[in-house]
């Protein structure tokens, strides 16, 4: 029996609440597909500051090093806002983990469910064609990490990418497309940026190893427009750090709720950190109304990308789709009639059990 070690870092706010539901789903799905999990929990973020004085302790980092993947909740809250910026939970936990494990690829799915078209700001005639997009963003290079200077009269930032950096993120995008609709858009600004010209040259060479993938090019300004005008044309969007940062947030706005958005950050060894895209929402942390779907979908991403358990991941995604189609929703999706956090998790679990028995 295959066994997977997972570092469980629930964090702050709603993190522990929604993490409980994700672990419940993972435990069942592992039994169905005959593999096992070893869940090792540790404090991170504000909870770690309160316990150890730092947002990421050496013990927690060591636990992560001994694991096959990290399932991350959320960190931060007003309680720690008085700390220096570089010591706050958000800055002092997640960013060091990304750097330590060289998590260079960020994957952000965006799917608009048929039962949730009312929650999207897009018109029905746009959504009805289907919206299911994966934004693949390079996370450790580009303009955020280049040389910069801020003077009194001028300032500059430098966008630098190497061939190797582009190649490895391109492989992630093409491999992802293979288990989706086999289409990749490279998002760039090759009409004015030298770095974008290099991206096109390198990606055009990498795609030769993926004859089954359809590669297209699109300028980033046009891509920003097409996301709201004709999003169904996209499958996988391959982006540099800056462009991916902007477009992934635009994608987050069109699906209707942060409670549905999952995220994966990967290195070249298949190790990943999986987390909801939303925040810790401390204002509702003790109300049992947080949407656990983003955390559960993050767990499904872990199954898919770190453990290659694609069918198990698909089962979870299908169960979520069915639950939503049945009108089972949390308060962020339907304020008039809603399930609590644990009830939503139970609903998804019951659908998985019914399909298993069927």
From Swiss-Prot:
Q: Where is this site: Important for catalysis?
A: 144, 189
Alphabetical GO biological process terms: L-leucine biosynthetic process
Q: Which NCBIfam families match?
A: leuB (TIGR00169)
What name has this protein been given in UniProt? 3-isopropylmalate dehydrogenase
Cofactor stoichiometry and binding? Answer: Binds 1 Mg(2+) or Mn(2+) ion per subunit.
User: What organism, scientifically named, is this protein from?
Assistant: Campylobacter jejuni (strain RM1221)
Q: Which residues bind Mg(2+)?
A: 221, 245, 249
Q: Which reaction does it catalyse?
A: (2R,3S)-3-isopropylmalate + NAD(+) = 4-methyl-2-oxopentanoate + CO2 + NADH
Cofactor entry:
Mg(2+); Mn(2+)
Task: Describe which pathway this protein belongs to, using the record's wording.
Answer: Amino-acid biosynthesis; L-leucine biosynthesis; L-leucine from 3-methyl-2-oxobutanoate: step 3/4
- Report the gene name: leuB
- Residues involved in NAD(+) binding: 77-90, 279-291
Give a short account of what the protein does. Catalyzes the oxidation of 3-carboxy-2-hydroxy-4-methylpentanoate (3-isopropylmalate) to 3-carboxy-4-methyl-2-oxopentanoate. The product decarboxylates to 4-methyl-2 oxopentanoate.
Query: Which InterPro entries would you find in this protein's record?
Result: IsoCit/isopropylmalate_DH_CS, IsoPropMal-DH-like_dom, Isopropylmalate_DH
Q: Which GO terms describe its molecular function?
A: 3-isopropylmalate dehydrogenase activity; magnesium ion binding; NAD binding
**Enzyme group, top EC level?**
oxidoreductase
GO CC, sorted alphabetically, is: cytosol
């Amino acid at each position: 029996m295959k066994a997977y070690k997972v570092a469980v870092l629930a964090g702050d706010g709603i993190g522990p609440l929604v993490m409980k539901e994700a672990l419940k789903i993972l435990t069942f799905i592992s039994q169905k597909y005959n593999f096992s999990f070893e869940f090792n929990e540790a404090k991170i973020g504000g909870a770690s500051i309160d316990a150890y004085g730092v947002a990421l302790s050496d013990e927690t980092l060591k636990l992560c090093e001994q694991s096959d993947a990290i399932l991350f909740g959320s960190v931060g809250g007003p309680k720690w806002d008085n700390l220096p910026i570089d010591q706050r939970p958000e800055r002092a936990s997640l960013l060091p983990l990304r750097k330590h494990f060289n998590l260079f690829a960020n994957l952000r799915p965006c799917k608009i469910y048929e039962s949730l078209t009312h929650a999207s700001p897009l018109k029905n005639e746009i959504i009805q064609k289907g919206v299911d997009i994966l934004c693949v963003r390079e996370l450790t290079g580009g303009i955020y990490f280049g040389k910069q200077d801020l003077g009194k009269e001028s300032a500059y930032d430098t966008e630098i990418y190497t061939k190797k950096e582009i190649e490895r993120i391109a492989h992630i995008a093409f491999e992802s497309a293979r288990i989706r609709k086999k289409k990749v858009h490279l998002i760039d600004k090759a009409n004015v940026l030298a770095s974008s010209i290099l991206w096109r040259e390198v990606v055009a060479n990498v795609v030769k190893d993926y004859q089954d993938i359809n590669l297209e090019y699109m300028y980033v300004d046009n891509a920003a427009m097409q996301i709201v005008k004709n999003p169904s044309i996209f499958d996988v969007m391959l982006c540099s750090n800056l462009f991916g940062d902007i477009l992934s947030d635009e994608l987050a706005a069109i699906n209707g709720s942060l409670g549905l958005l999952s995220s994966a950050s990967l290195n070249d060894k298949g190790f990943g950190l999986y987390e909801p895209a939303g925040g810790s929402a401390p204002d509702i942390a003790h109300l049992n109304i947080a949407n656990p779907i983003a955390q559960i979908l993050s767990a499904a991403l872990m199954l898919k990308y770190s453990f290659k358990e694609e069918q198990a991941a698909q089962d979870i995604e299908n169960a979520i789709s069915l639950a939503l189609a049945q009108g089972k929703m949390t308060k962020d999706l339907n304020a008039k009639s809603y399930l609590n956090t644990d009830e939503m998790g139970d609903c998804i679990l019951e659908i998985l059990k019914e399909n298993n028995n069927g």
